[in-house]
Amino acid sequence: GTTEPLAQSAADTLATITRLNQIGAAGYTPAGGAVYPETTLGRTMRTSAALIEANNNASYNQFVEAIAIDVGGWDTHAGQYSFNNTTGVFTGSMVTNMTALAEALNAFYRDLIVSRGRSVTVVITSEFGRRVGENGTTGTDHGFGNVMMVLGSAVLGG
């Protein structure tokens, strides 16, 4: 081992990459008929599930304690939604983002929590707030309103 902090960080990074390659997330099979969407978030949640499952293998014990996923595209000052009166369907960036989030969370919940009984908690939040009211371009500007969602078997809704 080395005592140089940057050298140790580099060694830790290489060790993590080696472990990730050994896990082989690409070959992961979701449980319970869960289907992860073919979106960036869906693929990331599927990989996260693979890492959590590998953690339950004795050779990777205590490997995964927390996973952070950063998903962009939520800073929507305009075009969050539009409504088609003929079809009765909402479209727009917020609809697209919320659908992708819901589908990925549904697959993750079904795969790990319902089907495998894993004790996993998912926390969804933003690093900045929004104004509650819409601006003049069907968007919202930065403000003090925010949301936090928590999902897991030990979470009591409310």
Give the location of each predicted region:
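Acidic/histidine-rich, metal-coordinating catalytic segments
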Residues: T121-G129
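Feature for exported/extracytoplasmic and membrane-associated proteins, marking the mature portion
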Residues: G1-E103, A107-S115, G133, V147-G158
